[in-house]
From Swiss-Prot:
Gene Ontology CC entries for this record: cytosol; nucleus
Cofactor(s) annotated in UniProt: Fe cation
SUPFAM superfamilies: Ferritin-like
Name of protein: Ribonucleoside-diphosphate reductase subunit M2 B
Active site residues per record: 138
Gene: RRM2B
Quaternary structure and interacting proteins, as annotated: Heterotetramer with large (RRM1) subunit. Interacts with p53/TP53. Interacts with RRM1 in response to DNA damage. DNA damage.
Originating organism: Macaca fascicularis (Crab-eating macaque)
Keywords of this entry: Cytoplasm, Deoxyribonucleotide synthesis, DNA damage, DNA repair, Iron, Metal-binding, Nucleus, Oxidoreductase
Subcellular localization, as worded in the UniProt entry: Cytoplasm; Nucleus
Lineage: superkingdom: Eukaryota
Length: 351
């Protein structure tokens, strides 16, 4: 007897099976309010999803550019770092420089085309813009610190030159290319990319801030981690609106897979011990972040991990932490979050 799990056993060849899966996903998409095609997608008002719109306005209010980050004090600090510290920082920056482009690939190729709700499309459009700013910032940091053109080229091509960066990139790229997975599964996967794959590296750079090092690097990291926290929160909000959510078992499978890759990245491939951090505590921190993401998605914790890094308590890996309310370093655009009725323009001022 043939294996019942094999496609031919069910009377389908692989192409037919793939077509069947695609059709199933199309049927499920029609059941999803977020994905249902409508001419309403071309017009923003009246707002149908005020919470999604509010997140878009929050992202808009947080806009910044690479030119606004002062790197003048970083180079003297860089020149005083140990070789291990330089190695670690440069390779982390190489990972980040490539990763934002991958996130944008997903937004352009998949999410922006699949989601039909204009409020969400506004958010994704702005996310694409700010991810480009992040990528420019990381590239500028590499350009500033690394003077050797060959080393610089090696870092800019990290997906090809560094196996451990390639492993993380391949995991994310696989989800972009996957035509069988549901929208909900891919929302979880990219929440894991921005909420888990970035978390340990953010923590490592904040560790440098605690030591008073590299003010330009650490300030840009503060802004970027705030942005990524908001993106992760937005993914969780989109997930809550889904009618056909993936099962808790499937969500846990995706999250655990991401946790294992990130733990390997920062404790074996590019160990945080190089900058004096504790690898065991870093593993715990990644588990803590994963638990927090699971709760925000509406599921129970897996690891029951405590946050081992006190300096990360107020850091914006949740978009709604102190960062936004405190107007971090004044990087909140004037009046963007104000009610429209507050913005009254008159011509009766005294000149």
């Amino acid at each position: 007897m043939g294996d019942p799990e094999r496609p031919e056993a069910a009377g389908l060849d692989l192409d037919e099976r793939s077509s069947s899966d695609t059709n199933d996903n199309e049927i499920k998409s029609n059941e999803e309010p977020l994905l249902r095609k409508s001419s309403r997608r071309f017009v923003i008002f009246p707002i149908q999803y005020p919470d999604i719109w509010k997140m878009y306005k929050q992202a808009q209010a947080s806009f910044w550019t690479a030119e606004e980050v002062d790197l003048s004090k970083d180079l003297p600090h860089w020149n005083k770092l140990k070789a291990d510290e330089k190695y670690f920082i440069s390779h982390i920056l190489a990972f980040f420089a490539a990763s934002d482009g991958i996130v944008n690939e997903n937004l352009v190729e998949r999410f922006s085309q699949e989601v039909q709700v204009p409020e969400a499309r506004c958010f994704y459009g702005f996310q694409i813009l700010i991810e480009n700013v992040h990528s420019e910032m990381y590239s500028l940091l590499i350009d500033t610190y690394i003077r050797d053109p060959k080393k610089r080229e090696f870092l800019f091509n990290a997906i090809e030159t560094m196996p451990y960066v390639k492993k993380k990139a391949d995991w994310a790229l696989r989800w972009i290319a996957d035509r069988k997975s549901t929208f909900g599964e891919r929302v979880v996967a990219f929440a894991a990319v921005e909420g888990i794959f970035f978390s340990g590296s953010f923590a490592a750079i904040f560790w440098l801030k605690k030591r008073g090092l590299m003010p330009g690097l650490t300030f840009s990291n503060e802004l970027i981690s705030r942005d990524e926290g908001l993106h992760c929160d937005f993914a969780c909000l989109m997930f809550q609106y889904l009618v056909n959510k993936p099962s808790e078992e499937r969500v846990r499978e995706i999250i655990v897979d991401a946790v294992q890759i990130e733990q390997e990245f920062l404790t074996e491939a590019l160990p945080v011990g190089l900058i004096g951090m504790n690898c065991i505590l870093m593993k715990q921190y990644i588990e803590f972040v994963a638990d927090r993401l699971l709760v925000e998605l509406g599921f129970s914790k897996i690891f029951q991990a405590e946050n081992p890094f006190d300096f990360m308590e107020n850091i914006s890996l949740e978009g709604k932490t102190n960062f936004f309310e405190k107007r971090v370093s004044e990087y909140q655009r004037f009046a963007v979050m104000a009610e429209t009725t507050d913005n009254v323009f008159t011509l009766d001022a005294d000149f």
